[in-house]
Regions:
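N-terminal segments that cap or nucleate solenoid repeat domains
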Residues: 1-32, 37
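Flexible, glycine/small-residue-enriched loop-and-beta-strand segment within the central core
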Residues: 5, 27-37, 42-133, 165-166, ...
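Short-chain dehydrogenase/reductase
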Residues: 22, 83, 126, 144-145, ...
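Flexible glycine-rich beta->alpha loop in the catalytic core of nucleotide-sugar glycosyltransferases
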Residues: 88, 95-96, 149-150, 156-157
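Beta-rich strand-turn-strand
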Residues: 130-143, 149-153
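Conserved beta-strand-loop-alpha-helix hinge in the C-terminal portion
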Residues: 158-160, 165-181
């Protein structure tokens, strides 16, 4: 995988650009002025980051694996030590599919009903391959989401493992990673 050079990263004019940021030269970045990238984060091949007015915040030591997307008008926050596996889609905006309104961004706003809500992944959260995270989702510290799960726009209590469509609590997650973080610092 080839990464953008420091000069190429700086030319994108991110809201904030930390140290040791690695972005694949095959990733697509839209509205970089609304994207905060902290130290030691990595964005792999074919990822899409499309920041709306709410922006995208990527914390320290965050990994976004290949083919993942972060898209929407509201904020999307991935706190320190969080990560998303391949083909994860995170949306802070979603059209109304009921038929009462018209979907799609090509339609004038007065004919649409868009669910715009922030998405928050707290420290030490991980989202498995192929999962979908919808507007309003709040994954508290230490949450793990299984592969191919559907994460609804609600709060998920800390240090639990969730899986399924929709994602449901499976079992508690160990907290040893907090001690490892302390040792690392």
């Amino acid at each position: 995988m080839a990464y953008l050079t420091q000069q190429q990263l700086e030319q994108l004019h991110f809201k904030y650009l930390g140290k040791n940021v690695k972005i694949s030269d095959k990733a697509s970045i839209y509205n970089a002025k609304n994207i905060h990238l902290d130290d030691n984060c990595r964005i792999d091949d074919f990822c899409i980051l499309s920041a709306g007015v709410g922006g995208i915040y990527i914390g320290k030591y965050v990994h976004i694996a290949a083919y993942s997307s972060l898209i929407g008008a509201e904020s999307i926050i991935l706190a320190d030590f969080s990560g998303i596996s391949s083909r994860v889609s995170i949306y802070s905006s979603s059209d109304d599919y009921s038929g009462e309104f018209m979907p799609h961004p090509t339609i004038p706003d007065e004919f649409r009903n868009v669910d715009n809500r922030p998405v928050y992944l707290d420290k030490h959260t991980i989202v498995g391959a192929g999962a979908i995270v919808l507007p309003g989702a709040k994954l508290n510290i230490g949450v793990a989401i299984g592969a191919l799960s559907l994460v609804l726009g609600k709060e998920y209590p800390e240090f639990m493992i969730y899986a399924g469509t929709p994602a449901k609590a499976i079992k508690e997650r160990k907290r040893n990673l907090l001690e490892l973080e302390r040792i690392m610092k």
